[in-house]
């Protein structure tokens, strides 16, 4: 068995012991990684930006520049949209391709990702700061599984016949929408790339995708693999650049039929407005979170402590799903805090390429400063700082694992998305009380409950205003189940539901001489 074929146990995000036990199977990062792809990818060709502008990309673990990237703008966006529209035109190679062949291309792309898994994991660690161990076993495994899942769906998307009244024969077709604009974040650059393109291509659409300006490297590398896999020119186009320029151009472009965005709520609102003002393009938004994690006294305490820890600290706390509002039943509150602090103090913060590292740096100086400012607000507003709270005195953007107790619902750290390694622990007395408090938020992405009482589990899960609820687990995401928010955006990604966001249902009715049942 080669290292690129290693399959880890389920829930690897919440099982650091399983990751550490597999260190002997982990390949070495690619030393002196050559960054081959720094240009715009349009029509299966690498192109310089029309403006000639470039922008730097940095290593967040050191603060040092990695390389310069060609900066796309509105003119480049227009070129990419023209290429995508041509690839989607009637009679094109892509439109005439069998659905099974689309699935084969996605499978081939997954094969190529597996082949280059160590390179891509190295690139993710270098560019985003996440530990190489996580990038290889979690992120890249998720990419491969997503591509293979939607490869299997490609020739299984079908309509139905409908027994309508009268002498008619009626059936439905599920057709691709057209050109899809996609904007992805910096916290899971490659995984979000796969989440976006896989269902879109599975349904037969073409894509114009913008990676985050902080983390464009793995998306551009995927452009080379997409071409190698055999996707026709113009089917996938990749525009590195900045949100206010390229993102705004995609959102308002009348040649784009649908837009999908993962990122902040503030930007999501702007995208929805631009989509409405332009051509009423369809919009899928996966936005922020301030997710409640409810721990009842009858839960397995040590297990709940570890799951809650992983639920907020995974990926340096840079997760939209982070369970940052931890509500603990009063009778076990003090013990839960004590054990959580002990766990946080054990966390290993260091170089992403050290296999023992659990936490790397934050993405950039702006995010680093935002997190420290919110930590200070918690101290000022009266929460008890149990551990951490400071930046680490080294190069890069490292922050100590931080735990607050005696947090109340009105504090900024309990209301605002921190997107960093900060755990806030609140107390509650009754189930009805905690349900009301947990739902009293502008966010509604995910929630979790830990209890050994099935009645409590089902009552809380049905009451939560969230798109996903986990019972006695956290971050249990997979390709087969839908993901999206209740108040944090609209639409769903992943699973069969994700296909609906990238297809239109057409009704076809034929006049027939005589209806027969």
From Swiss-Prot:
Pfam families: Aldedh. It catalyses: retinal + NAD(+) + H2O = retinoate + NADH + 2 H(+); all-trans-retinal + NAD(+) + H2O = all-trans-retinoate + NADH + 2 H(+); all-trans-13,14-dihydroretinal + NAD(+) + H2O = all-trans-13,14-dihydroretinoate + NADH + 2 H(+). NAD(+) binds at residues 184-186, 210-213, 264-266, 366-370, 417. The active site is at 286 (proton acceptor), 320 (nucleophile). Keywords: Cytoplasm, Lipid metabolism, NAD, Oxidoreductase. GO terms for molecular function: retinal dehydrogenase activity. Its EC number is 1.2.1.36. Transmembrane segments: none annotated. Its main location: cytoplasm. Pathway: Cofactor metabolism; retinol metabolism. Catalyzes the NAD-dependent oxidation of aldehyde substrates, such as all-trans-retinal and all-trans-13,14-dihydroretinal, to their corresponding carboxylic acids, all-trans-retinoate and all-trans-13,14-dihydroretinoate, respectively. Retinoate signaling is critical for the transcriptional control of many genes, for instance it is crucial for initiation of meiosis in both male and female. Recognizes retinal as substrate, both in its free form and when bound to cellular retinol-binding protein. Lacks activity with benzaldehyde, acetaldehyde and octanal. Belongs to the aldehyde dehydrogenase family. This is Retinal dehydrogenase 2.
């Amino acid at each position: 068995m080669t290292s690129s074929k290693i399959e880890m146990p389920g829930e690897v995000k919440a099982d650091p012991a399983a990751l550490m036990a597999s260190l002997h199977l982990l390949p070495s990062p690619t030393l002196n990684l050559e960054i081959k792809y720094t240009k715009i990818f349009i029509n299966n060709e690498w192109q310089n930006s029309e403006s000639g502008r470039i922008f730097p990309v940095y290593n967040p673990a050191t603060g040092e520049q990695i390389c310069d990237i060609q900066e796309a703008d509105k003119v480049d966006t227009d070129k990419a949209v023209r290429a995508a529209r041509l690839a989607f035109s009637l009679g094109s190679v892509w439109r005439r391709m069998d659905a099974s062949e689309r699935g084969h291309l996605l499978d081939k792309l997954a094969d190529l990702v597996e082949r280059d898994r160590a390179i891509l994991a190295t690139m993710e660690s270098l560019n985003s700061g996440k530990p190489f161990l996580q990038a290889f076993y979690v992120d890249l495994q998720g990419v491969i599984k997503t591509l293979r899942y939607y490869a299997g769906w490609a020739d299984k998307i079908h309509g139905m016949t409908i027994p309508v009244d009268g002498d008619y024969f009626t059936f439905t077709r599920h057709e691709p929408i057209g050109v899809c604009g996609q904007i992805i974040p910096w916290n899971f650059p490659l995984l979000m790339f796969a989440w976006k393109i896989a269902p879109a291509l599975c349904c037969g659409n073409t894509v114009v995708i913008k990676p985050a300006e902080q983390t464009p490297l793995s998306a551009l590398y995927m452009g080379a693999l997409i071409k190698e896999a055999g996707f026709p020119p113009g089917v996938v186009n990749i525009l590195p650049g900045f949100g206010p320029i390229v993102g705004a151009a995609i959102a308002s472009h009348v040649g784009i039929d649908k837009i999908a965005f993962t990122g902040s709520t503030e930007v999501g609102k702007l995208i929805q407005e631009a989509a409405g003002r332009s051509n009423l393009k369809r919009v899928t938004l996966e936005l922020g979170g301030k997710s409640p994690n409810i721990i009842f006294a009858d839960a397995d305490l040590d297990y709940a402590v570890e799951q809650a820890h992983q639920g907020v600290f995974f990926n340096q706390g840079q997760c939209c799903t982070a369970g940052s509002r931890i509500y603990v039943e009063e009778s076990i509150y003090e013990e839960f805090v004590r054990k959580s602090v002990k766990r946080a103090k054990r966390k290993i913060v260091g170089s992403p390429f050290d296999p023992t590292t659990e936490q790397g740096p934050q993405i950039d100086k702006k995010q680093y400063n935002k997190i420290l400012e919110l930590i200070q607000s918690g101290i000022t507003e009266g929460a008890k700082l149990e551990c951490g709270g400071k930046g680490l005195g080294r190069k890069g953007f490292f922050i100590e694992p931080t735990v607050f107790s005696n947090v109340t619902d009105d504090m900024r750290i309990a209301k605002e998305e921190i997107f960093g390694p900060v755990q806030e622990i609140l107390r509650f007395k009754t189930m009805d009380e905690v349900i009301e408090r947990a739902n009293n938020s502008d966010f509604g992405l995910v929630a979790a409950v830990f209890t050994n009482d099935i009645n409590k589990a089902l009552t809380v899960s049905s009451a939560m205003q969230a798109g996903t609820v986990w019972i006695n687990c956290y971050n249990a995401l997979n390709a087969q189940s839908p993901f999206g928010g209740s108040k944090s955006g609209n639409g769903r990604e992943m699973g069969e539901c994700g296909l609906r966001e990238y297809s239109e249902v057409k009704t076809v009715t034929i006049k027939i001489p005589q209806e027969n049942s």
